[in-house]
Amino acid sequence: MSAVTQHHADELARGADELGVALDADKQRQLLAYLALLIKWNKAYNLTAVRDPDEMVSRHLLDSLSIVPYAEAGDNWLDVGSGGGMPGVPLAILFPEKRLTLLDSNGKKTRFLTQVKLELKLANLEVVHSRVEAFRPESPFDGIVSRAFSSLEDFANWTRHLGGQETRWLAMKGVHPNEELAALPEDFRVEAEHALAVPGCQGQRHLLILRCTA
């Protein structure tokens, strides 16, 4: 029996509707196919501590979709420390016209992400196996997103060479990171903060949007 059922499809559709994110049948199919791959590969590759498929829908898929309204601007995005592909893979599915680069230093995780790209035929997705400090793209990214990657200070310092004055840095956090904000480098400023309500998720969720003023 498939690990992904109609129940998960209904949960995804209902949650996306609550978030105001439009999912057509093809995007929903791709997201569920990604979920199936995540469940399958997680057994051997330990991609996420979340094992329950029900929790994966809310804590991974819907959590990723919650930032869709804030990722609409810009055509070239980087998901740094992508891990199992959140939020980069869902963003690549939702925005086929954008280029999504998924960066991770863990070879097992980038092998999984490469398989996702192949099986879901995501031509707009690029997987890079590298440490963030060593990554040197040809041009700055329009947006750089992280989810459970590092402190805000490290996120800013480690990725500043990957952006420019027009770049937005999106940091997905749980509780509001007051102490991390106090340690933010002087040349970074908070452009916006958003409290996110993710269907099926307990606890706080926050999105911080940063700019580099240097």
UniProtKB/Swiss-Prot annotation:
GO cellular component: cytosol
Binding sites annotated in the UniProt record for S-adenosyl-L-methionine: 81, 86, 132-133, 147
Gene3D superfamilies linked: Vaccinia Virus protein VP39
Localization: Cytoplasm
InterPro entries recorded: rRNA_ssu_MeTfrase_G, SAM-dependent_MTases_sf
A Pfam family reported for this protein in Swiss-Prot or TrEMBL: GidB
Keyword Phosphoprotein annotated: no
Enzyme class name: transferase
Bilayer-spanning residue ranges: none
Protein role: Specifically methylates the N7 position of guanine in position 527 of 16S rRNA.
Protein name per Swiss-Prot or TrEMBL: Ribosomal RNA small subunit methyltransferase G
Species in which this protein is naturally found: Pseudomonas aeruginosa (strain UCBPP-PA14)
Native organism taxonomy: Bacteria, Pseudomonadati, Pseudomonadota, Gammaproteobacteria, Pseudomonadales
